[in-house]
């Protein structure tokens, strides 16, 4: 038998999938993705520090006990079109917790406004 929490999550993802399938533009999908990921709060003990790295906006995300001497560089997914440091804070918190390291996530430029190789240049500069 599925728990109440699992049933709620399954229904939430079914609804999200149905909503996403009706979207036709990158802007619509970005708004939907921000709203969807905004449902998931980062724990209160997460440390989020906004920084600039090589001209690119970035965030350090750390779980309690993360070593200052260990770091993970994370390039978020999203097909170079969606996603940001904000949309990936929660997974980065859990990556920090599992690895014992701080996680640096870059907020690189996205297409179609910044076509290839703009996002790669920002990542390599960082």
Please give the residue ranges for each predicted region.
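A glycine/proline-hinged amphipathic helix-loop "lid/cap" segment
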Residues: 1-66
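Short beta-strands and strand-loop turn motifs
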Residues: 58, 75-76, 105-108
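Short, charged beta->alpha transition segments
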Residues: 59-62, 89-94
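Glycine/threonine-rich flexible loop motifs
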Residues: 80-86
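Short beta-strand element of the alpha/beta-hydrolase
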Residues: 69-79
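Catalytic nucleophile-loop/oxyanion-hole region of alpha/beta-hydrolase
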Residues: 85, 91, 104-126
């Amino acid at each position: 038998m599925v728990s109440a929490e699992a049933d709620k999550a399954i229904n939430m993802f079914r609804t999200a999938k149905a909503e996403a399938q009706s979207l036709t533009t990158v802007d619509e999908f970005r708004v939907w993705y921000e709203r969807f990921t905004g449902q998931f709060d980062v724990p209160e003990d997460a440390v989020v520090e906004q920084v600039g790295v090589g001209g690119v906006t970035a965030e350090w995300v750390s779980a309690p006990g993360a070593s200052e001497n260990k770091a993970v560089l994370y390039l978020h997914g999203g097909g170079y079109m969606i996603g940001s440091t904000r949309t990936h804070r929660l997974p980065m918190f859990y990556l920090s917790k599992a690895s014992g390291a701080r996680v640096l996530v870059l907020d690189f430029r996205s297409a179609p406004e910044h076509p290839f190789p703009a996002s790669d240049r920002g990542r390599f500069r960082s």
